[in-house]
């Protein structure tokens, strides 16, 4: 089952309608996601594990976690190109040179799970890949 707990906080998050979600997996995985309301039922994820991001769910999105090493971006782009998936925007975030990094890619087409798996396996420095469809 799933255990869910809600806590109200007085912490100033820079916006009146912010949610901070901490999720723990049964095998020790942990992620912290911060999002805010944009109004009209729309939301934006603004932070994942300390990385500032902008994910609204209004575009197909591929998210990677990887080490900041040469060739990672090229391999991800190569795998998407092989599948004829066009990149509309791409942003990279890193904690430091050669350190942990996140890449957010918006695409014109959905990224199927099999393609996301190919992306993950395309370079040893890629540690995690998640494909999100439009919501």
How should these model regions be labeled?
Residues 1-135:
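A conserved regulatory-domain signal marking ACT and ACT-like small-molecule sensing domains
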């Amino acid at each position: 089952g799933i255990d869910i707990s809600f806590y109200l906080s007085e912490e100033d998050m820079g916006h009146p309608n912010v949610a901070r979600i901490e999720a723990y997996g049964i095998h020790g995985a942990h992620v912290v996601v911060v999002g805010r309301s944009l109004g009209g039922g729309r939301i934006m994820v603004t932070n994942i594990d300390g990385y500032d991001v902008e994910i609204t769910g209004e575009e197909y999105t591929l998210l990677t976690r990887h080490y900041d090493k040469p060739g990672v971006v090229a391999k991800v782009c190569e795998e998407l190109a092989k599948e004829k998936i066009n990149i509309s925007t791409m942003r990279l975030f890193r904690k430091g040179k050669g350190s942990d990094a996140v890449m957010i890619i918006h695409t014109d087409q959905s990224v199927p799970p099999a393609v996301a798996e190919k992306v993950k396996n395309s370079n040893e420095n890629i540690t995690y890949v998640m494909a999100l469809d439009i919501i």
